[in-house]
Amino acid sequence: MDTTTTMAPLPLLTTTSLLLFFFLASSFAADVVVAGGGGGGGGYDGGGDGEGGGGGDGEGGGGGGGAKMPHVNHGRYKCGPWVDGHATFYGGRDASGTTEGGACGYKDADGYGAMTAAVSPALFDNGAGCGACYELKGDSGKTVVVTATNQAPPPVNGMKGEHFDLTMPAFLSIAEEKLGVVPVSYRKVACVRQGGIKYTITGNPSYNMVMVKNVGGAGDVVKLTVKGTKRVKWTPLQRSWGQLWKTEANLTGESLTFRVMTGDHRKATSWRVAPRDWTYDNTYQAKKNF
């Protein structure tokens, strides 16, 4: 809990201290957005390995030729039930101090804005909960939808349910600043994003890091695989921390396709989202999302 709040001091482990630590760890990531190249650019996936928007696995990736992979209609994400929790806030009235990193590895430029939250360890789930969206309702009946972008301290003593440490703009949407800590009802809801899924690739040919962001639907990525157009077959990545995924496979020199699975076990495949001449420290955006 930030010292600007009026509630009694929390233990030394605060969202702010966690934020500073993970900001240092994530400072290497770049955010130069490059348009998704070649192929079909992305879309829902039914689990098959056929190419979308190009002919077979050959290099090039033009948008014509070849049979396109059919899109599967997964329907809308089903909201979870309302449960009890509580909310505090950290950072300034303009959300300053909340966007420079965090335990998910997101940065301010990643487009999540001021309506974000650090969530308690159970919801954070060692990074698997990053990117999920929650609707919170205060005693006044007002609601706000936030994205999980950081890890909060454990639940506050004497309060029910899980802890949401909100940015101040999000907190003020449902409660008065002077209250400091308030009971809320919350539920997991669909994430509505602008544009396609984004993949930031950093590292080197021996150790690749991929940040996944701007994911719609369930929002939380639980599995990520990559496929090239020549030597790289479908290869699972391992979670490094937050929404940063790693692989030691050499991905250079090939168009890259990423397949994302979210917490509700739905999949989306971004076909050839990174062109053959992709470079490190750039972000590649698919044409579609969940």
UniProtKB/Swiss-Prot annotation:
Chief location of this protein within or outside the cell: secreted
GO cellular component, as recorded: extracellular region; membrane
PROSITE patterns for the chain: EXPANSIN_CBD (PS50843), EXPANSIN_EG45 (PS50842)
Protein name: Expansin-A26
CDD domains named among the record's database cross-references: DPBB_EXPA_N
Lineage: Eukaryota, Viridiplantae, Streptophyta, Embryophyta, Tracheophyta
Glycosylation sites: N250
Function recorded in the entry: May cause loosening and extension of plant cell walls by disrupting non-covalent bonding between cellulose microfibrils and matrix glucans. No enzymatic activity has been found. May be required for rapid internodal elongation in deepwater rice during submergence.
Tissue: Expressed in flowers.
Subcellular location: Secreted, Cell wall; Membrane
The Expansin-like CBD domain, residue ranges: 206-286
Annotated GO biological process: plant-type cell wall loosening
